[in-house]
Regions:
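N-terminal catalytic or cofactor-binding beta/alpha core of small enzyme domains
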Residues: 2-168, 174-180
């Protein structure tokens, strides 16, 4: 199966897999499997530290379910760049150089540095050596977070319209032990 504009994939941002000949009331997404670093992603965290945040190979586990009629959405960008599983208002203003002009939602994840854009890659290990600009954060939301959410919304609405009810599973992996 191809992943081109005909099924709404966006190069280096997201992939959508689905069959046109068979359909099932299932939508899967893998928001944390991405490994394609955007050109403006310049963390001070090491590659091995960045890999700790990835749900490695989860996308590979679920892609073939599209052959049975499921719609599958995969993020190609890393969650360490911007996390599609966070609210776009879950912004840590302490990592931004300038005044953030949008609403902010304070959550437990944000409090530990793991909001929409991470402050820490691991507990007390900074992600960046300098603050991000307001426009950098806004561009991440516009070019990565929003298209991912729009694609997910479109898939959910299409399947719901077709079947009346659906199964939606947001796929992740877990470490056998925490960040040690």
């Amino acid at each position: 199966m191809t992943t081109d504009a005909s099924n709404k994939s966006i190069k280096d941002v997201l992939r959508v897999y689905r069959q046109s000949r068979i359909s099932a009331p299932i939508v899967y997404d893998s928001p944390h499997s991405g490994i394609i670093n955007p050109p403006d992603f310049r963390p001070t965290a090491t590659d091995s530290q960045l890999k700790t945040a990835r749900d490695a190979f989860v996308d590979e586990l679920i892609i073939d379910s599209s052959n049975l009629g499921a719609a599958v959405l995969v993020a190609d960008f890393p969650r360490t760049y911007i996390d599609p599983n966070r609210s776009k208002s879950e912004v840590d203003i302490s990592i931004i150089n300038g005044k953030w002009p949008h609403d902010v939602e304070v959550t437990k994840k944000l409090d530990v540095g793991m909001g929409l854009i991470r402050k820490y890659i691991l507990p007390n290990v900074p992600m960046y050596s300098k603050k991000l600009t307001v426009s950098e954060v806004e561009n991440r939301i516009k070019n990565y977070w929003s298209p991912y959410h729009q694609s997910l919304q479109n898939l959910l609405e299409e399947k719901l319209s077709e079947f009346g009810s659906i199964f939606y599973i947001n796929w992740h992996s877990m470490k056998s032990k925490g960040n040690q």
